[in-house]
Structures are given as structure tokens and as C-alpha cells.
């Protein structure tokens, strides 16, 4: 059930994932599906959208990178502190029972991809997860993904410090050229990674679902800050998960974002 108004919840636990990435666990459920996001609120600071890393009906997790003013303040919070949450918002990843899926995760996109893999294997899907990061020290959710039965984990790092040396999209492409096949791609990560996944999807005629990120304020489609050109899609309600046949029509996909007042 969607919680449309900010409600404060206590942080049940804090996990330090990397030097700049943390995971908060809350003893609450928003009824979220993989790919959806919530609005995270700190009174007197700001409210920002974040992908939901896990929601099993009892616990909810968010994983975030402390990069801006809001997330740096959030990173100071400890177990027992209060944080405002509302949601879930947006579209989610979808699949059919028994499909062979390639899940591509770049950076902290590994968090929602773990949630996706966790749910997809319940439908007897053959799940391959391609996790990419700059280096071994930046990899996320490797242990969690590796522990899921029914998941084949592929790791890629830009510097070759762990797994395949290069981009996870290149790793996927090489496997496909070698004869591997998939029914669908699901991806979350930096937009240039998504652009590359989109290209393979179009070339090989394999459907894909991509999670696009834009500046979001309301979550209701009212403010228009997350609108993408030229279709007028509001990513907070028509996305963030978009099918590739729609993505290829978006002129700013892989090119530019609008800022907090809508400027290119």
C-alpha cells in the first residue's frame, strides 16, 4: 500500500558497504516491487528519491551513495535514528515465469538488482547478474547475490581487480557473441551503461527494461521536473523502469539531464 505522506521510521541497522555507500534497514514494508523508489526525507534538510534495495513485507532496505548535501547528512544517521519515508513510487521490473534473464547492475544499481534477482528466482527464472564497478573496492551486493540459489553471478571491474577486466556490458556482449542467449535484459546503473544495454537490445532484438534516473521532487507527476523529451514521460510515474522501445525514442537518453528547475 502506497504511503503518500512522509512517515518517520527508526533505522533498525546500518551496514557500511564501501567507503561512501551505506545500507539502512527499517522494520517496515511499503509493499514495494523491484525497480520502484521511495522518497527519503530528513526534516530541515531535504527529500530525495532512492531506489528500494529490498522489501520482503517485513523489512525495507535502502542503499545510498553519500555524494550530495542530503545524502551526506543521511550518512551521519545511526541505528535508532528517525528517517522519513514515503512511497513506493513508479514502475517496476516485470518478467514471465521461467525466463532466462540478464540483470545488469552498475555501481549502486547492484542494490535494486539484488531485489530483482531475489524475486525473479521465485518464479523459476534462470537469472544471470552482471555486476560492474570501477574496482574491487567499489563492488556492491556480491556476497548477497552469490548466496542466491538460481543466480549465476558475473563480476566485472574497470581495472580488472576482480573478475572480468572491462565493462559488464562488454562481458554480456561477448557471451552473446559466443552463443549465450537471454529472453530479456533488466538494467540499473549509470546512463551510459544503460545506453550500451539499449544498443545490444536493439541489435539483437532482445527486449530490455531500463531504469532511468532524473531529478525528481514530488513522486506524483505534478511538478514536471522528471519529464523526458520529446514524449513528455514523467519518470516518477511512467518510469523509472522503461521498456527499450520507449527509451530509444527519448532524445535526451544518454545525452543530457535537466536540472532542478528544468534547464538542460
Question: Residues of each region from the PLM?
Answer:
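Short Fe-S-cluster ligation motifs
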Residues: 229, 233-238, 243-264
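Structural signal for conserved beta-strand scaffold positions within catalytic alpha/beta enzyme cores
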Residues: 13, 54, 155-157, 210, ...
Amino acid at each position: 500500500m502506497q504511503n503518500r505522506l512522509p512517515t518517520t521510521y527508526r533505522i533498525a541497522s546500518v551496514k557500511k558497504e564501501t567507503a561512501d555507500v551505506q545500507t539502512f534497514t527499517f522494520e517496515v514494508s511499503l509493499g514495494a516491487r523491484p525497480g520502484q523508489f521511495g522518497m527519503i526525507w530528513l526534516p530541515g534538510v531535504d527529500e530525495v528519491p532512492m531506489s528500494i534495495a529490498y522489501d520482503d513485507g517485513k523489512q525495507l532496505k535502502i542503499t545510498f551513495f553519500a555524494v550530495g548535501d542530503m545524502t551526506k547528512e543521511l550518512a551521519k544517521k545511526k541505528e535508532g535514528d528517525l528517517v522519513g519515508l514515503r512511497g513506493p513510487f513508479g514502475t517496476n521490473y516485470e518478467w514471465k515465469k521461467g525466463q532466462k534473464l540478464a540483470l545488469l547492475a552498475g555501481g549502486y544499481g547492484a542494490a535494486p538488482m539484488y531485489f530483482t534477482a531475489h524475486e525473479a528466482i521465485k518464479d523459476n527464472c534462470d537469472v544471470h547478474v552482471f555486476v560492474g564497478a570501477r574496482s574491487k573496492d567499489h563492488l556492491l551486493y556480491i556476497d548477497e547475490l552469490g548466496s542466491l540459489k538460481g543466480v549465476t553471478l558475473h563480476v566485472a571491474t574497470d581495472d580488472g581487480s576482480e573478475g572480468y577486466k572491462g565493462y559488464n556490458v562488454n562481458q554480456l556482449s561477448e557471451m552473446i557473441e559466443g552463443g549465450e542467449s537471454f529472453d530479456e535484459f533488466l538494467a540499473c546503473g549509470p546512463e551510459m551503461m544503460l545506453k550500451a544495454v539499449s544498443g545490444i537490445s536493439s541489435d539483437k532484438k532482445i527486449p530490455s527494461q531500463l531504469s532511468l534516473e532524473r531529478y525528481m521532487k514530488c513522486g506524483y507527476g505534478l511538478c514536471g521536473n522528471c519529464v523526458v523529451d520529446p514524449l513528455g514521460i514523467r519518470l516518477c510515474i511512467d518510469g523509472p523502469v522503461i521498456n527499450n522501445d520507449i527509451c530509444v525514442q527519448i532524445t535526451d537518453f544518454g545525452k543530457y539531464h535537466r536540472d532542478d528547475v528544468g534547464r538542460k
